[in-house]
Amino acid sequence: MSQLLVAVSSPWASDKLAEPIADFAKRLDASVFVAHVATLQETDEHESDATQRGEQTLQLFTDRLKAAGVEAEGIMLFSDDTAKAILNTARARNCSLIVLGLTGKGVLKRLIAGDVPTNIIRSSEIPVLLCPANWDGTI
């Protein structure tokens, strides 16, 4: 059985990506690891908020995949390097594909926060599927 790693950063992902990812996973007869990375650089006050939001996002996404009949597991990661955490997890779990939902960040935000998809693509030997923010979910 193939394994997919779907990296999510917000509840938007569960609304937008869960159904098409479930369809895709079924076509591939794949299980899905849903990963969220909480950064360690956040202040204590925001870190707990970020962790709670991440756990909620994971729960929403995995519940929707399971409801669609897909084997799914949520993984909460803590790292100051989001791309590296996603890649290391995909490698450790022997994933055959990494799926990323693009947020539609502008150039300035990517320069400040870093461009996780670009860093993953440059460093990954595992294929990466990018889902644009304005994607309608059609596969």
Language model regions located:
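Small/aliphatic-rich secondary-structure junction motif
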Residues: 2-51, 64, 68-70
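Short, hinge-like loop/turn segments at secondary-structure boundaries
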Residues: 49-53, 91-93, 116-117
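Glycine-rich, Arg-bearing micro-motifs that act as flexible, cationic patches
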Residues: 101-123, 136-139
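Intrinsically disordered or low-complexity boundary/linker segments at protein termini
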Residues: 1-16, 123-139
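Structural beta-alpha unit
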Residues: 66-98, 137-139
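General small-molecule cofactor/ligand-binding pocket signal
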Residues: 33-35, 73-77, 129
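Short secondary-structure boundary segments
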Residues: 36-37, 101-103, 132-133
